[in-house]
A protein has these predicted regions:
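Alpha-helical transmembrane segments in multi-pass membrane proteins
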Residues: 2-6, 10, 14, 106, ...
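Short hydrophobic "helix-edge" motifs at membrane interfaces and signal-peptide entry regions
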Residues: 16-18, 90-93, 108, 158-160
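Long hydrophobic alpha-helical segments that form multi-pass transmembrane helix bundles
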Residues: 22-107
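Hydrophobic alpha-helical bundle architecture
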Residues: 110-123, 136-183
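Structural signature of hydrophobic alpha-helical transmembrane segments
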Residues: 1-5, 94-104, 147-159
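Juxtamembrane membrane-interface segments at transmembrane alpha-helix termini
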Residues: 14-24, 36-48, 135-146, 166-172
């Protein structure tokens, strides 16, 4: 039911209240996501530990990869980068996270489909992902004890979701290929 509320907010407030298709100043999906994060912070940021789907799910939750990274960088006791799921687990979605951001493989399949159908071009997703890869690679090279590898950066969190599905929104993204690369 939370997803339905998010969709109603995204379409009703994020899109239609501004005049409908082509008139909205914000990405409606992102507006819906922000609405849900503000309205239901616990439900949007707490996930059952993988393999722990029992009647006691609320008591057995796992930290997300982003929560682990944040804890390590801030010096939280008992947190280590070794607590992160493997790159393969991040790829297939065997970790906690928000709806739409846990399985990098599913997101990449969505990207391939949209490129194949010519719904989007490669410019925006590739420029965003390449930029993050380069800068996170520099940080990892500087201090690999507190910064994760660029591959883990790409596979964890909402980066791919944003780069593939949100940044490519027709209304709120550039139209020229040069603009898309800079964006």
């Amino acid at each position: 039911w939370i997803i339905i509320l998010g969709a109603l907010f995204a379409i009703g407030v994020g899109k239609m209240s501004f005049g409908g298709l082509g008139c909205n100043p914000f990405n409606p999906a992102l507006a819906g996501r922000v609405f849900l994060l503000l309205s239901f912070p616990v439900q949007m940021t707490t996930w059952p530990a993988v393999g722990q789907l029992t009647a006691y799910t609320d008591a057995t939750t796992a930290a997300t990869p982003l929560a682990i990274m944040k804890g390590v960088i801030s010096g939280a006791p008992g947190m280590s980068l070794s607590d992160l799921p493997s790159s393969f687990s991040l790829l297939i979605g065997n970790n906690g996270g928000c709806l739409g951001e846990v399985s990098a493989l599913a997101l990449l399949l969505g990207l391939a489909y949209m490129l194949w159908k010519k719904i989007i071009t490669w410019h925006i997703p590739v420029s965003i992902l390449a930029t993050v890869f380069v800068f996170s690679g520099i940080m990892y090279w500087v201090n690999p004890e507190i910064y994760v590898s660029p591959v883990v950066q790409l596979l964890s969190g909402g980066l791919m979701l944003g780069a593939i599905f949100m940044a490519t929104d027709y209304v709120t993204s550039p139209m020229s290929h040069k603009g898309m690369l800079i964006y």
